[in-house]
Amino acid sequence: MYSRVLSVAAIVTMALAVQAANSTAPYGNTTNSTGTTNGTNGTNTTTSSTATQSSAASITNFSSGAFVIAMIAVACSVMSL
């Protein structure tokens, strides 16, 4: 009885881990930020900068949430044996 409940919990938790991994690993996403500055002579200057998120930061974002959920799923599957 408990093994069946734990195996179902492992499947559900692994599905949550996959969803968390998809939402927290934005590979190749770019963020654009524009800023407007007003100089002393009255001219307006608009600057823009583009920051590309590296894969290392995405791996860090992945391991923060989804890795813990995946380990809970592994623990549930091992305990269901």
Curated annotation (Swiss-Prot):
Alphabetical UniProt keywords: Membrane, Mitochondrion, Transit peptide, Transmembrane, Transmembrane helix
Q: Which superkingdom is the protein from? A: Eukaryota
Q: What is this protein called?
A: Uncharacterized protein C27E2.11c, mitochondrial
The subcellular localization recorded is:
Mitochondrion membrane
* Membrane topology, record value: Single-pass membrane protein
Annotated S-S bridges: none
Q: Which organism is it from?
A: Schizosaccharomyces pombe (strain 972 / ATCC 24843) (Fission yeast)
Q: Where is the transit peptide?
A: 1-20
Which Gene Ontology cellular component annotation is one that this UniProt entry carries?
external side of plasma membrane
From the record, give the transmembrane residue ranges.
Answer: 59-79
- The biased composition feature labelled Low complexity covers 28-53
Q: Does the keyword Membrane apply?
A: yes
| Stretches for region Disordered | 27-53
